[in-house]
Structure formats: structure tokens, C-alpha cells
């Protein structure tokens, strides 16, 4: 038998207790424990040491991590368990999105829009030739530029059916020039659920070229990877409709897998 656990456990203070429970379970005959990593809070939040988090992770027989870069990070910091790459998270969607002939917005940004995680949204007024649509919580609407519309917040299960835009942006930090700070560093090893959100909605993506997901996006031609949002602006303005449609066709293959689990 296999027992699957998730990491980090919510509430976080129970993660150590859960790791202890996994040790007890693993001692049962013919029972193996598997851990699915959603986030590494030692990097994302800095609310515990890397060594303590690795100790929790080492309590399981096998670990499902995001990608090769996260796998290397875990091994370099003392993870001794079998590591398996997930690559992309599922994003189960019930229902079909209404077909939009021509999206009113160039770029959609969904998720945690707090100033700590997404402070860059208040600099998007400098990218005045593009129109942005924001979905999520933590927005200070009065500080947004005239080219930015706040569309509200929706539950994760219906969000893919609500968002509209020609491109979905995966970006963190307070700069439009690059992803910086702890959240920016985390993108170098993390596969954000946001990527699966956009793909489940059939939207091509824009990602930072130093992020872990840039490899997937480039290899399977699911969007573009850029050094800055200004660079994205230039590409979007010059990409042909034929090339854009080719990317959309590539996404459909992944969408079918992601939304069905």
C-alpha cells in the first residue's frame, strides 16, 4: 500500500507532526509513504530553516518534487530520498470556457496580488501600450495605471472559466525589469500552480527567462520567456497571428491532460 502526504501541511505548525506520523506509517509492513511538494516554505516564506524542512522531507520513502532544478536543490541540501519530477500540476476544471473571438486584454495576471508578492503591477503603467486584466486579492486599485483593470477575485475552480486575455503572465517581485527578491529566487526552482491555471484556460504564457518553468514553455512552445515585461511588450506587438495560433494549438494538448487530471 502507498500513503500519500502533501507538503507543506496546512496549518504549517502541523508539518513536523505529520512527518512523525509518516515515520510510524512507514514502519508498517508493505506500506510506503510518498510526499508531494507544493511549496518549499524555507525559501518561499523563510519561516523555517532549510535543514529543518529537509528533515521533514526525509521522513518519507519517496518525494514528488517540481523539476530537475528543485531536485538538485533538495539533494544539495541533504535530501536522501528517491525524488520524482512532477513537471506540471493538474488543474481540474469542470465546464467549458466561453469562446472569446477577440480578448479585450493583452495580458492577464491572476493569483496573489499583494504588494509583497506582486508589487510590479503598480509599475505596469510604464508598459502603456498593453492592457492588463488582474484577478485575485490584495490589490490597491487606486494605485493602478489607466491601462490596468481589476476584474475581481474568483474561487480557483471557476477562475479558468472567467479569465480573459491573450497571454497569461507568471511574474513575481516588485520590478518589471526582472523577478527579484525571495519570490523571484523561488521561481528559479518552483513550478507555480499559476502556469497550470493559464494552460487550463487555453492561454499562452509569458514567463521569466531565468525561471524553472522557462524550459517547459520554450521546449513545448507554450508561450514566451523574457528577461523583462518590456521585452514581452515588444514581442507581443510584433508576433504574427499565425505564430500566436500555433502556440494556442500546442497548449490544447497540455490543456486536455491538465484539466482531466
State where each predicted segment sits.
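Short beta-strand scaffold positions
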Residues: 65, 207-208, 226
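Extended catalytic core of nucleotide-activated donor transferases of GT-like folds
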Residues: 1-74
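Histidine-centered beta-alpha loop that forms part of the nucleotide-sugar donor binding/catalytic region
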Residues: 7-8, 37-40, 68, 86-90, ...
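Conserved catalytic-core segment of nucleotide-activated headgroup transferases in glycan assembly
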Residues: 91-164
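Nucleotide-sugar-dependent
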Residues: 163-201, 207-215
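Donor nucleotide-sugar binding/catalytic pocket of nucleotide-sugar-dependent glycosyltransferases
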Residues: 61-75, 79-95
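A charged, aromatic-enriched C-terminal amphipathic alpha-helix characteristic of glycosyltransferases
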Residues: 227-234, 240-261
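A short acidic/histidine/glycine-rich donor-binding loop in glycosyltransferase catalytic cores
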Residues: 220-226
Amino acid at each position: 500500500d502507498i500513503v500519500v502526504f502533501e507538503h507543506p501541511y496546512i496549518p504549517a505548525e502541523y508539518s513536523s507532526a505529520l512527518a512523525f506520523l509518516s515515520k510510524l506509517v512507514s514502519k508498517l509492513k508493505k506500506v510506503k509513504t510518498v510526499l508531494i511538494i507544493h511549496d518549499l516554505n524555507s525559501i518561499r516564506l523563510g519561516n523555517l530553516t532549510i535543514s529543518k524542512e529537509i528533515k521533514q522531507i526525509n521522513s518519507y520513502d519517496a518525494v514528488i518534487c517540481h523539476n530537475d532544478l528543485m531536485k538538485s536543490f533538495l539533494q544539495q541540501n541533504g535530501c536522501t530520498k528517491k525524488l520524482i519530477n512532477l513537471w506540471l500540476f493538474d488543474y481540474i476544471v469542470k465546464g467549458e470556457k466561453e469562446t472569446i473571438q477577440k480578448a479585450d486584454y493583452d495580458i492577464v495576471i491572476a493569483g496573489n496580488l499583494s504588494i509583497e508578492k506582486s508589487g510590479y503591477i503598480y509599475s505596469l503603467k510604464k508598459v502603456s501600450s498593453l492592457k492588463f486584466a488582474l484577478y485575485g486579492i490584495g490589490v490597491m486599485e487606486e494605485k493602478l495605471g489607466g491601462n490596468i483593470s481589476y476584474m475581481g477575485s474568483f474561487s480557483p475552480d471557476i477562475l479558468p472559466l472567467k479569465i480573459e486575455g491573450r497571454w497569461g503572465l507568471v511574474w513575481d517581485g516588485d520590478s518589471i525589469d526582472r523577478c527579484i527578491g525571495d519570490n523571484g529566487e523561488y521561481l528559479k526552482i518552483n513550478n507555480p500552480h499559476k502556469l497550470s491555471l493559464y494552460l487550463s484556460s487555453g492561454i499562452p504564457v509569458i514567463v521569466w527567462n531565468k525561471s524553472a518553468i522557462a524550459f517547459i514553455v520554450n521546449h513545448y512552445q507554450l508561450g514566451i520567456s523574457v528577461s523583462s515585461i518590456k521585452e514581452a511588450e515588444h514581442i507581443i506587438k510584433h508576433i504574427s497571428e499565425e505564430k500566436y495560433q500555433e502556440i494556442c494549438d500546442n497548449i490544447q494538448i497540455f490543456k486536455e491532460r491538465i484539466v482531466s487530471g
